[in-house]
Amino acid sequence: MAESTALLHSMTTWLAPWEFSPLWGLACLTAAIVYMRGARRLGRHHPAVGWSRPIAFLAGLALVYIVTQTHYDYLSQYMFFPHRAQHLVLHHAAPFLMALALPGAALAAGLPMRIARPSRRLRPLVDLLQHPLVAPLLFVGLIYFWLIPEVHFNAMLSQDLYQLMNWSMFIDGVLFWWLVLTPSGRLGHGRRILLLLAVVPPQILLGAYLTFSPTVLFDVYEVCGRAWPLAPLVDQQIGGLITWIPATMMSVIGTLIVLRQLRRDETRRQRMPPSRTPRDVIG
């Protein structure tokens, strides 16, 4: 009984915020409420809802909460490889799951009109950030930028810069994965696959560089002290592998999903009756 109580206390402590950020907590809670409100309005049998999509969307939000509002955030600030795993979640895994849910219809249905109308003013900015030439450059560029040793050093020592870094990664991840996984979006299947493949080589190069670098590139973790007694170079090598392999696999999985969407659309098109010409109607 005592062991169970101690385990429960340990889990509760770990799940409690390390440094509570009202903005992250409010964002996760608001997104969940708006989505579920919209899903309820549309109905469970609506094609935009179903049962798997809410699970994917809420799982993405849960991952965001875990890496930003639990004691995992402590590890992310005092070890390099947990930090890279945190950004893998914020920039890849969580936005991927949320975009996979195709939540546009549910979010639109759940958003109060007084908020929905002003939010349309952001459309030109979103269109710019999701431009086919801008989106992959921004997606890869942010990863490189925040891993410039001098920039990374300052970001890990400044609470404001640290939050800016995490928010920029998450927002850009949502914009990118929403663009490439939405079948009825602004891009066709081929262009979405090209974008997914375009971001792979730069991530491989960066991950390989971090993994095989003979020197420690990020000494901020020595200044602050590491959470675990792990050799600095080993910490960096594991972080490099996280930047390299899982991030690349996300693009591969995304490509397979788009190919599946393409096959489904072609099957649906073949099942449609041929369109009748005016001559057919007259005859």
Q: What kind of region is each of these model predictions?
A:
Residues 1-283:
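Alpha-helical membrane segments of multi-pass proteins
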